[in-house]
Amino acid sequence: MSESRTSADGGMETSYGFREVPDGQKQGLVNQVFHKVAKRYDIMNDVMSMGMHRAWKDAMISALNPRKEPGYKVLDVAGGTGDIAFRIVEASGRQAHATVLDINGSMLGVGAERAEKKKLSGNLTFVEANAEELPFEAGSFDAYTIAFGIRNVPRIDAALSEAYRVLKRGGRLLVLEFSEVDMPLLDKIYDAWSFNAIPQFGKAITGDAEPYQYLVESIRKFPNQENFAAMIRQAGFSRVTFTNYTGGIAALHSGWKL
């Protein structure tokens, strides 16, 4: 879980994968990871999920069911390459406007380039900012989405509080994230894949295994489904639920600002 702890010398520390690092260092380390993988991010997701992330994202968009009417506004956080935002805009019949927010400029650059090629630039705004301090007024969005990004935020509680703040009354939060496998045999298989195969595939694809090692470790440090649902409730959300995908390899969390 990404929560701060006091170190032996009295400073505050948080987890970066299986390592403990000073609070102020995690964001910079995470940024380095995503600068390295930005241009191969979709391949990275294929490796991390054994290709299943595409079906999970489709299920997320189906759950959101974006309105097919002008004025529907979605904030997609940690969505730099645009994958989720593109799906939302298309599912709305190109009526929705999606603001793609990411702290990493390299990821946003990839997304903006793809948006232009898809002729979706008019439906999208790309913003470089921190999920813990969103540069938007309260009640600005109908929906807030984040896919495979919340576990990389140093202060998850702050990000959830900000999500609640910027949503309109009646707005919805959807968080898709790797989670805790709830099937013993699958758990063993997925662990073997994660710790043995994923870093090596990453090295073969990008020449660097370290980003993939961090990403695998960050999944194991993330709160399980029940604990993360409790964090969402603590941020003020109502009707909080989660749905497991592929035996809990991933989970979709939902909450409403009522």
Curated annotation (Swiss-Prot):
Binding residue positions for S-adenosyl-L-methionine: 81, 102, 130-131
Superkingdom of source: Bacteria
Pathway entry: Quinol/quinone metabolism; menaquinone biosynthesis; menaquinol from 1,4-dihydroxy-2-naphthoate: step 2/2; Cofactor biosynthesis; ubiquinone biosynthesis
Reactions the enzyme catalyzes: a 2-demethylmenaquinol + S-adenosyl-L-methionine = a menaquinol + S-adenosyl-L-homocysteine + H(+); a 2-methoxy-6-(all-trans-polyprenyl)benzene-1,4-diol + S-adenosyl-L-methionine = a 5-methoxy-2-methyl-3-(all-trans-polyprenyl)benzene-1,4-diol + S-adenosyl-L-homocysteine + H(+)
EC numbers on record: 2.1.1.163, 2.1.1.201
Enzyme class: transferase
Any single GO BP term: methylation
Disulfide bonds: none
InterPro entries for this protein: SAM-dependent_MTases_sf, UbiE/COQ5_MeTrFase, UbiE/COQ5_MeTrFase_CS
Region called Disordered, residue ranges: 1-21
UniProt GO MF annotations: 2-methoxy-6-polyprenyl-1,4-benzoquinol methyltransferase activity; demethylmenaquinone methyltransferase activity
Nucleotide-binding is among the record's keywords: no
Keywords noted in UniProt: Menaquinone biosynthesis, Methyltransferase, S-adenosyl-L-methionine, Transferase, Ubiquinone biosynthesis
Function: Methyltransferase required for the conversion of demethylmenaquinol (DMKH2) to menaquinol (MKH2) and the conversion of 2-polyprenyl-6-methoxy-1,4-benzoquinol (DDMQH2) to 2-polyprenyl-3-methyl-6-methoxy-1,4-benzoquinol (DMQH2).
Family affiliation: Belongs to the class I-like SAM-binding methyltransferase superfamily. MenG/UbiE family.
HAMAP family per the UniProt record, alphabetical: MenG_UbiE_methyltr
Designated name of the protein: Ubiquinone/menaquinone biosynthesis C-methyltransferase UbiE
Organism per entry: Rhizobium johnstonii (strain DSM 114642 / LMG 32736 / 3841)
Gene of this entry: ubiE
